[in-house]
Regions:
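Glycoside hydrolase catalytic-domain context in secreted enzymes
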Residues: 1-619, 623, 637-641, 646, ...
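A generic signature of intrinsically disordered, low-complexity regions enriched in glycine/proline
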Residues: 47, 368, 507, 572, ...
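Terminal connector regions
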Residues: 618-665
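Charged, amphipathic alpha-helical linkers/stalks
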Residues: 646, 653-723
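Long, low-hydrophobicity ectodomains and other hydrophilic envelope-associated domains
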Residues: 689-806
Length: 806
């Protein structure tokens, strides 16, 4: 094992700077002459995506086969941190087998709005639940000697303009909603690394945000690992290094090294800043490489497939079961309808896409079951094209069956990295099919596949609804077993399903192309809004049915937590997820009506009862006091609410809590809309009162951070032409129903990323020349680009020669 302190004394400043950026898309720099190995990083929130051939960061090129587990959005419905730890351990095993040192996951973004195209990669709208699950994944991954890298830190809630948007959020909301999940993950999971997000937070890029990285992450939480940029996410590398960012990825080449050298020479940063970052990076490199050298180069694919199936079983959510239609008895004549039954959708699109070791198919699993499958019909075109013939054939089959199993859902491109959803609806051809089938056979079980929320105005057309989410490569077997009663669905929703998208508090301006993203709703995301505003929803947070029933009784409560008895009052074994919420009545602060502060799973046989204890931690009663700039507790009476969902509260006890707050955070601000939870249309004036300062107005500037999608603002025909070509290509891909992820990435990419993602082929000086061209200085800009290109080639060659010791 290398001694980092001694090694730093041997390295030249140039060598040190070179180590703080990647060498290839998913590899760090190695320096064999100093005993520093090169290590692999790989995407892997729900399955490893190591690309042995040509690498890319969007999941476009094939990767090495790996187990595709249910997505985070699915596993969150299990409310099972221990299951997350098992999945994490399997991910760690596969990473070690493929010589990957860092797994880029889990994803911890808060689900502010269900239209976020990447919601399937994230756990929940609740930071406590998300943090607990993420900590489990992290512990599991790192138990195999591999480093976990939770992402994206922080306040990154949309794909639109994700590389250049500025999240404007008040400090209390930042702390209580968007950072608490990361805090739990860091303190309880102890990750070796963390990935910064692309966006700015209150005017400063997350990757160079001193408040986030140095004051909170490293200072308050004690994180001592490596902060890794998202791919192409570095804006000012030197400022990032100074303020706590460790490794710039993927491969910016020699220009990045020269940037740091110049910053040291100018006094912008010091060599001690460089050393501090290397003291975070090098132990990770040495430790993971040593663990990988001792790890087996194979894993038990069958065992991991079985784990993926069990994870899918625990993640299924039964949303409707009218007349106890489910489970289906052996011998039931069933018609299987829907393209998803034969061509499964089990994961999302983008950088998390896994090349699965195998994929189970629901139709095959149903045929192998004790049901009498009388036939299958596709029923609809999965990409939304109307097809009367498909619908007619499906209806004809439905008339011959006792029960119809209809598989519906979102197609592959509806949920993807780089692209936010345009609505929460299922394709109309699927809804039309459901209505047509219901007219000839009302006994319909809908199996729904999606990575996030969908509107369900069609719910009355089916008798049962089983939410399969994106269940991974073994999800089909789990669904078949749930339909036939071999498995009792026990999952509960980790996010609220509204009646309509318009009810979501951030609906009015989510994913606009403005430079600023204003978090006007404050604390009120998800159930925190719906319960406070007393707004009806389709399915509340924490909701999920079972084939059995449970009774809660004999609750005892104090400041430490609660204990209660749970009894299975039904006729079959089942698992109940008991949820503990905290409510403060007559609060002097504005706050959500109730907040999740604990949960527990219990599996019981029919008639069995068990005593449960749910402990409260140091986050149970705290709030961020924006005036005192610290965590405090408001004293007084609290209600501890125990229930089967946020709306289905079974037991309640009141306790008295000693307070610490001495200064009222909002005594001089009129924030009536926040006290009422009336945040659907927050005015500029009210939001500025919450922020404590004027709302920043993002203006389009022709500089390094101009995105390619904004080149129509350029003063150059070349810029207009590039913008026009990209726009046309994007429109064509949309019309084909298959948006091009590569074009989408480029469209939202700032010019500076050209210098961060081309392995040194383009320097920042060349980007500055392009900016001059776009500003209208056509000839000077062209000359600058040519000059900087020649200079870049020469300097890169000289630097590589020095680093090789030639």
């Amino acid at each position: 094992m290398q001694n980092t302190e001694l090694l730093l004394k041997k390295l030249t400043l140039e060598e040190k700077c070179a180590l703080l950026s990647g060498a290839e898309t998913f590899k760090t720099r190695g320096m064999p002459e100093h005993g520093i190995p090169q290590i692999w990083l790989s995407d892997g929130p729900h399955g490893l995506r190591k690309q042995a051939g040509e690498s890319d960061h969007l999941g476009l090129n094939p990767s090495v086969p790996a187990t595709c587990f249910p997505t985070a959005s699915a596993v969150a419905n299990s409310w099972d941190a221990a299951l997350g730890e098992e999945i994490g351990a399997a991910l760690g095993e596969e990473a070690a087998a493929q010589e990957v040192s860092v797994v880029l996951g889990p994803g911890l973004n808060m689900k502010r709005n269900p239209l976020c195209g990447r919601s399937f990669e994230y756990f929940s709208e609740d930071p406590y639940l998300a943090g607990k699950l993420a900590a489990g994944y992290i512990r599991g991954i790192q138990s195999k000697g591999v480093a976990a890298c939770p992402k994206h830190f922080a306040v990154n809630s949309q794909e639109t303009r994700r590389m250049a948007s500025d999240s404007i959020v008040d400090e209390r909301t930042l702390r209580e909603i968007y950072l608490t999940g990361f805090e739990i993950a860091v303190k309880e999971g102890h990750p070796r690394s963390i990935m910064s997000s692309y966006n700015l937070v209150n005017g400063t890029y997350a990757n160079e945000n001193k408040h986030l990285l140095m004051e909170i992450l490293r200072g308050e939480w004690g994180f001592d690992g490596a902060v890794i940029t998202d791919w192409g996410g570095s804006n000012d590398h030197a400022l990032g290094v100074k303020n706590g960012s460790t490794l710039e990825m993927p491969a910016p080449g020699g220009d990045s090294v020269r940037e740091l050298l110049a910053a040291v020479e100018s006094g912008k940063i010091s060599e001690s800043d460089i050393d501090a970052r290397l003291s975070e990076l090098l132990p990770l490199v040495f430790d993971t490489k040593a663990a990988l050298d001792a790890a087996p180069r194979e894993f038990d694919a069958a065992a991991h497939h079985a784990l993926a199936r069990r994870a899918a079983e625990e993640s299924l959510v039964l949303l409707k079961n009218e007349g106890s239609l489910l489970p289906l008895a052996a011998g039931t004549k069933v018609a299987v309808i829907g393209d998803f039954a034969k061509n499964p959708r089990y994961q999302g699109a983008g950088s998390s896409m896994v090349n699965s070791t195998q994929v189970d198919v629901l139709l095959d699993k149903l045929i192998d079951s004790e049901l009498n499958v009388i036939g299958y019909q596709q029923g609809f075109d999965r990409h939304g094209k109307p097809d009367a013939a498909l619908q007619k054939s499906a209806c004809e089959l439905a008339t011959q069956a006792d029960t119809v199993i209809l598989c519906m859902g979102l197609d592959e491109i509806a949920e993807s990295e780089g692209l936010d959803r345009s609505n929460l609806r299922l394709a109309q051809n699927q809804v039309d099919l459901l209505q047509a089938v219901a007219a000839v056979n009302p006994k319909i079980v809908v199996v729904l596949y999606s990575g996030s929320v969908v509107e369900t105005p069609w719910l009355d057309n089916c008798q049962a609804l089983l939410y399969a989410a994106l269940g991974g490569q073994a999800g089909a077997g789990a669904v078949a077993d749930a339909l036939t009663g071999k498995v009792n669905p026990c999952g509960k929703l980790a996010e609220t399903w509204p009646l309509a998208y318009a009810d979501v508090p951030s609906a009015a301006d989510f994913a606009t192309r403005r430079k600023t993203v204003e978090y006007r709703e404050g604390l009120y995301i998800g159930y925190r809004y719906f319960t406070t505003a007393e707004k009806a929803v389709r399915f509340p947070f924490g909701y999920g049915m079972s084939y059995t029933t449970f009774a809660y009784s004999d609750m005892v409560a104090d400041e430490q937590g609660v204990s209660l008895t749970v009894t299975n009052t039904g006729s079959v074994a089942g698992t109940e997820i008991v949820q503990l919420y905290v409510a403060k009545k007559n609060s002097e602060l504005f706050r959500p009506a109730k907040e999740l502060k604990g949960f527990a799973r219990v599996t019981l046989a029919p008639g069995e009862k068990q005593r449960l204890t749910i402990m409260l931690d140091d986050k149970a009663f705290r709030f961020w006091n924006v005036k005192a700039n610290r965590w405090e507790i408001e004293g007084g009476e609290y209600e501890l609410l125990v229930g089967a969902s946020v709306e289905d509260i079974r037991l309640c006890e009141k306790i008295s809590v000693h307070g610490t707050a001495t200064v009222h955070p909002y005594e001089d601000r009129d924030l009536d809309c926040y006290y009422k939870g009336d945040v659907l249309h927050v005015s500029d004036a009210d939001f500025e009162k919450l922020l404590g300062h004027p709302i920043p107005k993002g203006k389009t500037k022709i500089d390094r951070n101009l995105t390619l999608g904004e080149l129509n603002h350029a003063r150059s025909p070349l810029g207009w032409l590039v913008w026009l070509v990209l726009t046309i290509l994007l429109d064509v891909s949309y019309k084909r129903g298959k948006p091009d992820l590569n074009i989408l990435f480029q469209y939202n990419m700032p010019l500076r990323a050209l210098a961060k993602m081309t392995n040194g082929a383009i320097s920042m000086g060349m980007v500055d020349g392009i900016v001059m061209e776009l500003q209208g200085f056509w000839i000077l800009g062209l000359v600058r680009v040519i000059y900087e290109a020649i200079k870049n080639v020469v300097l890169n060659a000289q630097m590589e020669k020095r680093l090789r010791g030639a």
